[in-house]
């Protein structure tokens, strides 16, 4: 079956934004204008098509990246049909893992900003992730009809806070309740959308007299930015500022956007049906197709570098980037095809796990509606049914031409809670539900506490775990009670301990056991665990050295202070002895474990706690309360700045996670509900001794 849309006309984009910038409404409008959805779903009444999980509708925040396909021929119908695959990304900080995961498979992104709030803390996180994956982007300043809307302030913030070069290709006509449309700086025409048709129809008009001068000024800046795309253009521009044609300007802006040098900037009000249509045109004009992006790099099974170009003729390769459980078809694996073609029924190799699997059905998704398709080609994003082994980040490829595309990296969870099923019947279902949810979300972990037998769930924040427990109830019918959130402490050492021995000797008639290891233990800040074999002259036979390492690795799970995992230590195996008959792997495993425990006791063990980057936005009159409260939580204030437009103050602080439980409630009461905050994990830091003692004592009481 030939390709319906040439790959040059594909756009795989993400729509990213800070919570409440109106991203879901923007996506809804895209679906409406592209003719996929006929009635506009409003977030205000919880009916948005993209937000298809129940909790999202209640909380009004977007959690899962639903992948949607739409078609667009330009707002004036002047483009050949383009296929736009949209990955909806969440804007809440507890879900940055979702954003990171979708950034990995995008070719371009549209950053949505609130015209009043502008660049907010979460916008910075998303921007950093887009930089990490080198994703070209355009910016859409939404909610231009709000009181306090200021397009140019957001343009400055992108430069100051994000270090991005924002180039307006439109400027707004009016603001707040007087917002009417935009001036297209390329065409130098005003665009006014028609309210009757919900913005489907529009007219080009002359630029209002009061804006002519400003429009010329901003057009000049835009043309100058375009001219820097090449020597020839720059020369042409310098000879005559008005000599660049519309097509030349667009092509040059496109080139610089794809090279991540500039960010074209647009504006509108999705809620009032203004501007989204022009943003779709900008997606086609300025964001890359899969063919504009460099070939994807990976490794073959022998670890040699390999690459795949975005072509149907190359061997099939794809990356699984999301797993979801669907009540009707079971497990759905969302994947992005980088090269080649695959049909339902084909056998694929999961190169990451080295397992072959048969591809069942292939579904194309529109939010949570689906259409079954026969095949997918380079550049497509689709969902597969029937892949049992695949998890997020796995490479799916042609069994004859294996390749492993780069692995995604996922953060370690910082918060844990015990969960108990309410009834015996819930017990079995809970295990199944948690495993299924952990498969979908790599930043969520499940384990059993060996001492208490409790099931412990861990994640990226309180909201993250709240939603997991919520989903367990709704999707799997499991009622569970949840313990108090626990901090994921770690243990490490402060000094060096040398010549520490562990000797395991057992004589009990017949064959005994003998293992003897001498180690040096030292701090290894920020580098995790390292084991160095420094045995000379065969005092410990080669075959037993991995056993010593294994014994130590097992002991790392539970430190000597309070049984928390040990991090950032370096162990040198320096000496030891063995017995011809009695030595075996188990004895050396025990010796390694004993030596490590003793060395850790001697090397001044300390407790580490997760520190969070906290940002609070508060009206000025509550500054004193907010600062006092943060200090009482052992917080260190690192800076304050005015929120643009007289919107109060932004306080940046570093606060231990242990002190942040229930913070939203106390912030509400300290500021009459007028302040907001975001928090994300920063790093681990040593815990003050009085806090350490309390944590260690509590752990011992718990054990006793």
Curated annotation (Swiss-Prot):
> One Pfam family this chain carries?
EFG_C
Kindly indicate whether the keyword Isomerase belongs to this entry: no
Q: Report the GO terms under cellular component.
A: cytoplasm
Q: Which UniProt keywords apply?
A: Cytoplasm, Elongation factor, GTP-binding, Nucleotide-binding, Protein biosynthesis
Chain positions recorded as GTP binding sites: 17-24, 88-92, 142-145
Give the organism the record lists. Burkholderia thailandensis (strain ATCC 700388 / DSM 13276 / CCUG 48851 / CIP 106301 / E264)
HAMAP family named in the record = EF_G_EF_2_B (MF_00054_B)
- What residues does the tr-type G domain cover? 8-291
**Matches recorded under InterPro entries:** EFG_II, EFG_III, EFG_III/V, EFG_IV, EFG_V, EFG_V-like, EFTu-like_2, G_TR_CS
Entry-linked PROSITE patterns: G_TR_1, G_TR_2
Enumerate the CDD domains for this protein: EF-G, EFG_III, EFG_mtEFG1_IV, EFG_mtEFG_C, EFG_mtEFG_II
Listed name of the protein: Elongation factor G 1
Q: Which domain of life is it from?
A: Bacteria
Q: Which family does it belong to?
A: Belongs to the TRAFAC class translation factor GTPase superfamily. Classic translation factor GTPase family. EF-G/EF-2 subfamily.
Biological role stated in the UniProt entry: Catalyzes the GTP-dependent ribosomal translocation step during translation elongation. During this step, the ribosome changes from the pre-translocational (PRE) to the post-translocational (POST) state as the newly formed A-site-bound peptidyl-tRNA and P-site-bound deacylated tRNA move to the P and E sites, respectively. Catalyzes the coordinated movement of the two tRNA molecules, the mRNA and conformational changes in the ribosome.
Gene Ontology biological process terms in this record: ribosome disassembly
User: Where is the protein found, in the record's own terms?
Assistant: Cytoplasm
* Record-linked NCBIfam families: EF-G (TIGR00484), PRK12740.1-5 (NF009381), small_GTP (TIGR00231)
Say where the protein is mainly found: cytoplasm
In alphabetical order, the GO MF annotations are:
GTP binding; GTPase activity; guanosine tetraphosphate binding; translation elongation factor activity
């Amino acid at each position: 079956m030939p390709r319906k849309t040439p790959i040059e006309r594909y756009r795989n984009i993400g729509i990213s934004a800070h919570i409440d910038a109106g991203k879901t409404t923007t996506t809804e409008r895209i679906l409406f204008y592209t003719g996929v959805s006929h009635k506009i779903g409003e977030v205000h009444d919880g009916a948005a098509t993209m937000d298809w999980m129940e909790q999202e509708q209640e909380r009004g925040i977007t959690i899962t990246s639903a992948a949607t396909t739409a078609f667009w021929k330009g707002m004036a119908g002047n483009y050949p049909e383009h296929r736009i695959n949209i990955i909806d990304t969440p804007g809440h900080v507890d879900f940055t893992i979702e954003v990171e995961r979708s950034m990995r498979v995008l070719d371009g992104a549209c950053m949505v900003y609130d015209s009043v709030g502008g660049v907010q803390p979460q916008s910075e996180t998303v921007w950093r992730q887009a930089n990490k994956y080198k994703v070209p982007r355009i910016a859409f300043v939404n909610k231009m009809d709000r009181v306090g809307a200021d397009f140019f302030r957001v343009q400055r913030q992108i430069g100051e806070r994000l270090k991005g070069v924002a180039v307006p290709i439109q400027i707004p006509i009016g603001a707040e309740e007087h917002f009417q449309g935009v001036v297209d700086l390329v065409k130098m025409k005003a665009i006014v959308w028609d309210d009757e048709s919900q913005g489907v129809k529009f007219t080009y008009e002359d630029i209002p007299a009061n804006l002519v001068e400003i429009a010329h000024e901003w057009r000049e800046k835009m043309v100058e930015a375009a001219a820097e795309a090449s020597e020839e253009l720059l020369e042409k521009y310098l000879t005559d500022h008005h000599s660049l044609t519309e097509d030349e300007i667009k092509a040059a802006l496109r080139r610089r956007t794809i090279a991540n040098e500039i960010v074209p900037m647009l504006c509108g009000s999705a809620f009032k049906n203004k501007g989204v249509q022009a943003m779709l045109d900008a997606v086609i004009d300025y964001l890359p197709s899969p063919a504009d992006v460099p070939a994807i790099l990976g490794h073959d099974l022998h670890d040699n570098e390999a690459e795949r170009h975005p072509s149907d003729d190359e061997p099939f390769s794809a990356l699984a980037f999301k797993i979801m459980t669907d009540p009707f078809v079971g497990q759905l694996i969302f994947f992005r095809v980088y090269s080649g073609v695959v049909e339902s029924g084909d056998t694929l190799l999961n190169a990451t796990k080295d397992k072959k699997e048969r591809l069942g059905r292939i579904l194309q998704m529109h939010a949570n509606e689906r259409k079954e398709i026969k095949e997918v080609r380079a550049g497509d994003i689709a969902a597969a049914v029937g892949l049992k082994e695949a998890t997020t980040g796995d490479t799916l490829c042609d069994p004859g031409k294996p390749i492993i595309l780069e692995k995604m990296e996922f953060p370690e969870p910082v918060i844990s809670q015990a969960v108990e099923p309410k009834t015996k019947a819930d017990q079995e279902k809970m295990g199944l539900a948690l495993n299924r949810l952990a498969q979908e979300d790599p930043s969520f972990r499940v384990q059993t506490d060996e001492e208490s037998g409790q099931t412990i769930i861990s994640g990226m924040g309180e909201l993250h775990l709240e939603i997991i427990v919520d989903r367990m109830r709704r999707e799997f019918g499991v009622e569970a009670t949840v313990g108090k959130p626990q901090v994921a402490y770690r243990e490490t050492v402060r000094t060096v301990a040398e010549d520490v021995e562990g000797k395991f000797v057992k004589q009990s008639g017949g064959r005994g056991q003998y293992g003897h290891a001498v180690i040096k233990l030292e701090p290894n800040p920020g580098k995790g665990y390292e084991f160095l074999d420094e045995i000379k002259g065969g005092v410990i036979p080669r075959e037993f050295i991995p056993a010593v390492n294994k014994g130590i690795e097992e002991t790392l799970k539970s430190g000597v202070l309070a049984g928390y995992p040990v991090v950032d230590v370096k162990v040198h195996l320096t000496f030891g002895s063995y017995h011809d008959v009695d030595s075996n792997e188990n004895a050396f495993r025990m010796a390694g474990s004993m030596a490590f425990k003793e060395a850790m006791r001697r090397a001044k063990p300390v407790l580490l706690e997760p520190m969070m980057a906290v940002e609070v936005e508060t009206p000025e009159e509550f500054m004193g309360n907010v600062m006092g409260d943060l200090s009482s939580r052992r917080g260190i204030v690192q800076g304050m700045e005015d929120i643009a437009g007289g919107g109060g103050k932004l306080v940046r602080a570093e606060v231990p996670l242990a002190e942040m439980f229930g913070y939203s409630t106390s912030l509400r009461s300290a500021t009459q509900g007028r302040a907001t905050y975001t928090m994300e994990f920063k790093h681990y830091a040593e815990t003050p001794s009085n806090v350490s003692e309390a944590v260690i004592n509590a752990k011992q009481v718990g054990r006793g």
